[in-house]
Every structure is written in structure tokens, then in C-alpha cells.
Amino acid sequence: MFKIINTLLLFAFVLCIHKNATAQQDWKDINTVEEVCTNYTETIENMLDQFNLDYPGLEKVKRDFENGNLVNACYELLEYYKNGNTASDLRKTLPKKTDQTKSETDTILNNVFVVQNVRGKVPYLTNGHRDWYYKGPNNDKEWAWLSNRHSQLNNVFNTYLETGNPKYAQYIDLFLKDFIILGMPYPAVKSSTSVWRGLEVSFRAKVWPKIFYGLLGSDYISPATQLLLLSSLPDHAHYNRNFHSSNNWLTMEISALATVAAYFPEYKNSEEWLDYAIETMTQSMKDQVYADGVQTELSSHYHNVSLHNFELFQEICDRANRKLPDFYNRTIEAMYGYIAHMVRPSGFRVMNNDGDRGSDQNLILKGAKKFGHEDWEYIVTNGQTGRRPEDGPSYFYPWAGHFVSRSDFDRDAHWSFFDMGPWGSGHQHNDKLHLSVSAYGQDFLVDSGRFAYTGEVAEKFRPYAQSSAGHNLLLIDGKGQQNGPRLANKPLGEDHFKIATNFDYASSSFDQFMDLEGSVKHTRVVFYVRGQFWVVVDNIETDRPRRIDALWHWHPENTVVKDRYTVKTLNERGNLTL
């Protein structure tokens, strides 16, 4: 009896020693299949459970896994991917080894990330992992979110392909291992944390497949990291499948779900993920794009974001040989048409709602080529190439309520944007009846744009940017507009606009103001005499005397002076007088 007890105690003691020895292995030193299977047995077993082991080519993986040989099953799985033809468009010819470097990427290798022009160095925790919850030098949660989308990792990946310097691939290996291990276990709940928020999940799910397939034959990416990545991708897909949002967030999250499904058809749930993605994305397009082709958030920036993700989804379905409804392609064409018709003569987009003043020229040229629209090419090249449109030069989108007036299509053309639409389904500003004006390549009257979402700038200026005070509107007794209707339930009728040979006319009203006693209604009429000038008439209907402040925001590059009853610019070329 004494001998038996001693044996049991010795056995227990040996088990404890083995377990502790395993736990003590530094995660950074886990590189081989054997090491990852020993240290993260449950994770790797769960990873293999995510695969359809009856998928053609996985016969050896199934045999070894069912026989309890986890290590061999993982070797066979990696061999399957190395020798397969899945995701042929992502597989890369590995570069020859060099010592070439790129200084910008070397900054990333020091864990210095630039997010929205803010530079921050991600610190290390006591366990040797990077602090993926670090919010940058300004303690900005947006900084942490964006850094966890792994665009910096994509940058390092591209630099490795360009230079062949092993240090870039080695950084990717350790980066992914660090991130995935520290993020375990997957929480499987909707979250707004720095790591597990829907947008960040979706961006990583698009970056990681590029890296996995692009570096499959590399000696600098360890088998352990490859297996950890394969274990985490189903978690990313699960999140985007079950916890996605709506509007443009949905397009990003669902296109990420489809990305994982299309590039990894071996996962058990890939077929269901793709079915769900097609159904959801198709319905989302119907819900968030008006009949005139404008995305319902009514921000040119997020219109482009949605378009990008709709197109990305279309490309994914094409690669997976999955057909989309005809209206899907027609809607994408209409979305391009809106961008082409709204663009300023300079090639920059409208800065409405949460928008940025970015160039749409290349995007429009891409759409023109894709759909054979030489008229769009003509517009965005100021008539240098393409074919002159049979309509225009002014355009009205009745569901969005967006009216653009032009004198012509040349670079010096007059251009104005008049907003008669609803508030928008997201990223809204209280800016109905706002008017922007440009001419001679110069912006004169401008929109506040987005400014920033979080951080010091946002705390100071975000409320102003969203309010009527940040737009070319009227304040009534110092009060701006309340939130208007989110969506249009019908297009604006012909009584609201007219486009004639020599003039444009547009008119709309708004009657909901913040904390204002009594009734008031603001009607704005914009009359543009083509090639000459604009007439803006503001009419106020009210039940009592009011103080009216008319706001006109000039682009800061203008030199503006007041001359008795007029305000005017003193630019060298191209001026505006009010």
C-alpha cells in the first residue's frame, strides 16, 4: 500500500513539474508545430474542429486528428496550404534576401505607429507582450482602435515583398504571435474594446489572409504563428457574422466575413458565412442606398467607404463563383455616377456631414473605365479626355436632396453644392440648406467637415463642426437646427428645383430649431445664373420678432475684407463678393 501511494504521489509530482515547465516557456520562443501544440493544446484542437475535414485535400489531416496525433495533423494542414491553390491571387513569389530597408517601415518596427497623423509608441507589458490597449499619446480610444486594424502590419508586409529584408517578415511573425496569444480567449460577445470592436475585427480579417497566403513559403514565418492565425480567423468571422452593425459598418464587417469564407473554404462554416453575407449585404444595399444611388448617411466620404466595401464584396463573390443579383451591379454604377456628378472642378469631393476634402479623381476614373462612362472621365479630367456628357453641367439627386450647380466642366468652372436633404442615417451634421461655393480652382464658401471624432481637437471643435454654427446657415435668436428626419421617404418633387440652359433654381425649408420658443420656418432659395453669379434668398416666417445671424464660412486660404455693405476676397486669381 505504501509503495502504491508513493507511486501515485510521484506521478502527480511529475505531472505538476511538466505542466509548470510548459507554462514557463516564453511565448516568443514558441515557433514549431510541436511547441504550439504543447503550449496551446486546447486552442489548436479547437482550431482543427473549425475545419471541414471532409474537404478535398484534408484526408491526411482528418486521419491524424481522429487518431489523436495533433502534431501530425497540423503538419499536414500546413502542407495542404503550401501545396494548394486556394487564394491564388494572394499567393506571392517570395523576394530574394537583401539588407535593403525603408525608414518609414523601420519606424513601425520600433512599435511607433502613426494613426490619423498622431505618432505613438506602443509600450510593452511586464509579460513581454505589447499593450494593445494603449491609446496613444493623447489617451485617445480612436487611436487604439485604428492601430488594431493592422494597416501598419500590411505596410510591413508590402515592404518585405519590396525589399526581401528578413527583419520585416520576422517582425510580422512576432507581431501576430503576440497579438493572437494575448487576445485569447476570444470573448464571443459584442464589444467596443480596443481589440474586439467590429470594425477592427473586420479590418484584421482582410489583412491577415494576405499575410498568411503571401508568406506561406517563407522561413521567417513560424508554423506556430501560422496555426495561431488559422485558429483566430474563425473567431473573427464569428464576430462579424453575429455582432455586426448597420450602414457602412455593416458593409465593412460583412465583406470581412465573406473574405474569410472565400479565402478559407475549408472552414466548416464557410458556406453558411458566405450565404449569410450575400443575403445580408444585398439587403443592406437596398436599405442604405437610395434609388438615385446615394448612400443614406449623406456623407460623400462614407458613401465612398460603402462603395468600396460593396465592390470588395462583389470581387469576393466573383472569386468564389457566387452570383449576385443584377441590381447589385446597377447600384454600384449609380453610386459611381453620384460621385462623378458631385465632384468639384478641382477633383475634390463634397465635404458634407462627416466628410473630408479628399480627391475623388482616381476613383471616378476607375468607375468610368469599369462601366464604360466616358462622360465621367470628361467631367473629372475637365474635358481633357473622355466624352462630353449629354446632360449637365448641373445635377440634382432627388432622394439625397443634393444639388450641384456648374458653369461648365473646365477646371475654372463655377461650382456650388446646396443641401436640401434629410439629416442622414449616420455621421450627421445639423446643416440642411447649407451652401458651398467654389470657382477658378478656389474654394470660397465651405463646410466645416468632420474635424475629428475623439481627442483634444474633437473635444474642442466637434460640437461646433456638427452644429449649424459650423455651416453656411442662419441662426435664429442664436439657435441652430435640431436633428431633422434621418431618412427620405420620397424624392423631392420638381417644385423644388429646375435646371435650365442658362440658370439653376432650388428651394427648400426647415422649421425645427433648438430650444426656440414659438414657431419659425427658414426657406432658402438658390438661383444660379450660369457662368455669372448666385442669388441666395432667405425667408423667415415667424410668430414674433427674431434676431437673425447669417453665417458664411470662408476657406482660410482666402484673404477676406469688409467693404461697407459687402464682404469680398482679395485673391490674385478668382474672387467672390457677398
Model-derived features with residue positions:
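Bacterial Sec-dependent N-terminal signal peptides
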Residues: 1-25
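Aromatic-lined, polymer-binding surfaces characteristic
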Residues: 138-333
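Carbohydrate-active enzyme catalytic cores, enriched for enzymes
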Residues: 290, 294-445, 499
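Acidic/polar loop patches that form or flank catalytic/metal-binding clefts of enzymes
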Residues: 325-326, 347-353, 413-417, 443-448, ...
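Extreme N-terminal leader/anchor segments
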Residues: 24-121
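Asp/Glu-centered strand-loop micro-motifs enriched in Gly/Pro and often flanked by an aromatic residue
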Residues: 92, 96-99, 113-147, 157-165
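Acidic-aromatic substrate-binding/catalytic surfaces of carbohydrate-active enzymes
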Residues: 64, 68-84, 434-435, 439-454, ...
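CBM-like, beta-strand-rich accessory domains located in the C-terminal region of large
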Residues: 22-24, 362, 456-458, 462-578
